[in-house]
Amino acid sequence: MSSAIQVAKTATYLPDLVEVQRGSFKWFLEKGLIEELESFSPITDYTGKLELHFVGSEYRLKRPRHDVEEAKRRDATFASQMYVTCRLVNKETGEIKEQEVFIGELPLMTERGTFIINGAERVIVNQIVRSPGVYFKDEQDKNGRRTYNASLIPNRGAWLKFETDKNDLLHVRVDKTRKINAHVMMRAIGLSDNDVLDKLRHPEYYKKSIDAANEEGISSEDQALLELYKKLRPGEPPSVSGGQQLLHSRFFDPKRYDLGRVGRYKMNKKLRLTIPDAVRTLTPEDVLSTLDYLINLELDVGGACLDDIDHLGNRRVRSVGELLQNQVRVGLNRLERIIKERMTVGETDSLTPAQLVNPKPLVAAIKEFFGSSQLSQFMDQTNPLAELTHKRRISALGPGVLTRERAGFAVRDIHPSHYGRICPIETPEGPNAGLIGSLATHARVNEYGFIETPFWKVTDGVVDKSGDPIYLSADLEDECRVAPGDVATDADGRITAELIPVRYRLDFETVPPNQVDYVQLSPVQVISVAASLIPFLEHDDANRALMGSNMQRQAVPLLRPERPLVGTGLETQVARDSGMVPITRVNGEVVFVDSTQIIVRDDQGVDHYHLLQKYQRSNQDTCLNQRPIVQQGDQVIAGQVLANGSACEGGEIALGQNCLIAYMPWEGYNYEDAILVSERLVRDDLYTSVHIEKYEIEARQTKLGPEEITREIPNVAEESLGNLDEMGIIRIGAFVESGDILVGKVTPKGESDQPPEEKLLRAIFGEKARDVRDNSLRVPNTERGRVVDVRIYTREQGDELPPGANMVVRVYVAQRRKIQVGDKMAGRHGNKGIISRILPLEDMPYLPDGTPIDIVLNPLGVPSRMNVGQVFECALMGWAADNLDSRFKIVPFDEMHGAEKSRETVEGYLKEAAKQPGREWVYDPENPGKIQLIDGRSGEPFDQPVTVGRAYILKLVHLVDDKIHARSTGPYSLVTQQPLGGKAQQGGQRLGEMEVWALEAYGAAYTLQELLTVKSDDMQGRNEALNAIVKGKPIPRPGTPESFKVLMRELQSLGLDIAVYTDEGAEVDLMQDVNPRRSTPSRPTYESLGVADYDED
């Protein structure tokens, strides 16, 4: 194919897409960890004799025990040991002991921005939280009167809330406790009446609060401290010293109260203070300025304004580094307590730092964070895009923030300040909608954790693109007039239009070019990476674009990937930044290439090795495989792609296939979004994917002796063991079906398991028969495939095994899955459906030149869903690309080149395609984009011309093989005795309340009765029914369902005398079913009962 044609000209270069992860972790190693260690120095014992100092700047990390691949293979954590220099100072003798102490293991980030924890790749998701600082809000009381309040929110510590009331009095609350007169608080802090009144711009309003305090008899600092103690610690005897200590520890102790760098920055900015950055606790000045601002709000003077808590200027992002820093602080807090106890207990003279520092609390805190925090997630590795999006995800859930249930509409909604920072499209459907978002393409997180987006400066109507773009946070952007990225400019960068739409203070207005301050970098900077891969995005409805971006993440990597004919130009960078494609770091020559490694020799003659992944299993069971695209002797330059990864072709991301598509109904097979496909997709393996399943078995130490992995399995035919080696483990390359043995294992049987005749034989002959039972690992139902890898772990090899296990064997089975009926497919515009039928090639509709159509979609799927982008992509651009033998790159939002630009561009290319000899049928001026198709079955043309083209269609990970399931007899729930639910439990299909109504509506009494009894939880009845079916006898009448008995027992346990009686008044014993079957006569069957018997009943 010829090279790609770039249609719309705009900045398509994006910044490094994983920088948000890597940059944050780098900050943690260089600054965050040192900050934490030094904030805990010195730790002093209770007598003040001993001091322990951590020299944070001198910490060091040891080389990790395993590299990344080895850690994955051994189920280990890719981590490094942390050592820090500690100094123990004895104040009495002046002696100083210095020692390097081990303080724990720190998981390290891989180059791709992930962590390997116990062999699994995990991602730490960015969390978006309310920024610490001061917030002013208004509330309406019951009478509709507006009152104002100010909240001082620290990074950690107690909240302080000032509020006004209807009597113009000021109150304060500490951590949502009872109200306290604001002036009591001021006096307790140590401010006199005049101190306060001098600082306020409207002291007359505050005087009422002073009078109220005087009336209560609180006129001095001591009285104020007593009052404060009473309110905060009711029920305890108040004292002045207690009040002082309480106040200090709540607001002025750096260990208990911390505004953080961000909180101090926000506070200074909002209240126009000049307090230095290093002061992280509250100061009297903070409190006074807050009061002053609140009074100005109440009186509506001085330019005071309320805060919008959903504005991105008031929300910040916590990335890996900061989350990890908080976790280290938790660990160090626990460690500090232990150190103080050990200082008190130990002999002062002989103590060393190593004896004091116990690494366990820190290790536990870090382990807990990576292993079980809500923000540490198992990486979505379905394809490279899923991986990349996961690392750029922003979550409002997690510890210390919202829960799904509490989040209202305001938090979830799109806010004007999201523009260019958080994608307005990509968010999950369902309960998490709006709480989980994705970083926009050009956005970055600044040092304070606020999201910034880049702009070009505009001076007198000329866009200056000479230097680097200017990054602005949401706060700064509010004060500027910002034009969109698609404004038309001439060659000198002068804006050509007379009036430009701009955003200013969260609103839209139109201004002349000389009033514009900034211009956006690119039209794509508003949306996320996944959304930016959708061509003609601007012609899609937002709901469908959302589904389109989410479904691209679920596309399965195919056996033969193909890049899209119509792309947006960002495909290359997505593939590179996902880490799926190996890239050379140096200029040089390729000196060696095979399927497993590429060696590049640089200009200095140094060899650089690039190992390729071959058929490895991803977290989602898809296949990770890399194929070289360079040849021996090629010259390469730094940054060049050396090999294709899974779902990549030519260094671009390639999630699906370009298929020939027609929009037309076909015999009802594409009713309700169903998809009709041609047999060609199966035959030519267009949508065949490789899936690798992992099976694991442990040989454990039991009470009766060790389990053994062996080939000697009791009661198994020799042919079933054909593919096992002498140890009883399947050989690599064997093809296995469901039920085949993968690893033979026998477990010792207990004495009680022996039948009496065997005990007799053993008593007579003293013959110790091999009393073991078969406990082998077998291929589960519905699974099959080829064994691609076997891994054996034993303690002798130095592997870490679970407690009680002597050996662990893992078998990897790969299967090729062709596309089949029931699989889910989708386009990039949210047009999804299930395959309803695979039609032979000769029956498919075909083009005038005889080419059969690949996929037939329903035209009714377009108008109501308003995702017209698919028509532009398929029928127009894709069709032109196919006929011109080229690929197009179209950046979304092209109206800057003129109105109706998409249609013009597309029609121009279609006309060009029709000029080729013998292809005049490609473009019909009467019906542009439509073609007269011919029915493959009859050879007759269809009545109407049909929209035909090439569209990019993906196969999604929701495969029918993983979902189809049937049950005959299986496990039952312990209490209700009903079948379990779900495929994993081999469960049954639930017949719910509404299904019962449906059967009742038709009067299907017998069907309903057996569904609720014999087929569900009538224990005796189901055994008898099975017996009757096996022996070919009539099925007996059903008995009482077990769940009814459970209900009876539950009511009886509440003390209700409830029982079942016959017409004669005799109580029926429902528990008689439990008695052995031998003593009770079998139940009558329907056939054995005469009419007379029914009357008796």
Curated annotation (Swiss-Prot):
The Gene Ontology terms for molecular function here are:
DNA binding; DNA-directed RNA polymerase activity; ribonucleoside binding
- GO CC terms on record? DNA-directed RNA polymerase complex
Any Gene Ontology biological process: DNA-templated transcription
What is the residue range of the signal peptide feature?
none
Cross-referenced InterPro entries? DNA-dir_RNA_pol_bsu_ext_1_sf, DNA-dir_RNA_pol_bsu_external_1, DNA-dir_RNA_pol_su2, DNA-dir_RNAP_su2_dom, DNA-dir_RNAP_su2_hyb_sf, RNA_pol_bsu_bac, RNA_pol_bsu_CS, RNA_pol_bsu_protrusion
Q: What is its EC number?
A: 2.7.7.6
Q: Does the keyword Transcription apply?
A: yes
Record's catalysed reaction(s): RNA(n) + a ribonucleoside 5'-triphosphate = RNA(n+1) + diphosphate
Annotated region described as Disordered, given as residue ranges: 1073-1097
The top EC class, named as a word, is: transferase
PROSITE patterns noted in UniProt? RNA_POL_BETA
Q: Name one Pfam family in it.
A: RNA_pol_Rpb2_2
Sorted alphabetically, which keywords does the UniProt record give?
DNA-directed RNA polymerase, Nucleotidyltransferase, Transcription, Transferase
State the protein's purpose: DNA-dependent RNA polymerase catalyzes the transcription of DNA into RNA using the four ribonucleoside triphosphates as substrates.
Hey, which family's this protein in? Belongs to the RNA polymerase beta chain family.
Q: How does it assemble?
A: In cyanobacteria the RNAP catalytic core is composed of 2 alpha, 1 beta, 1 beta', 1 gamma and 1 omega subunit. When a sigma factor is associated with the core the holoenzyme is formed, which can initiate transcription.
Name of the molecule in the record: DNA-directed RNA polymerase subunit beta
Q: Which organism is it from?
A: Synechococcus sp. (strain RCC307)
Q: State the organism's lineage.
A: Bacteria, Bacillati, Cyanobacteriota, Cyanophyceae, Synechococcales
Gene it is expressed from: rpoB
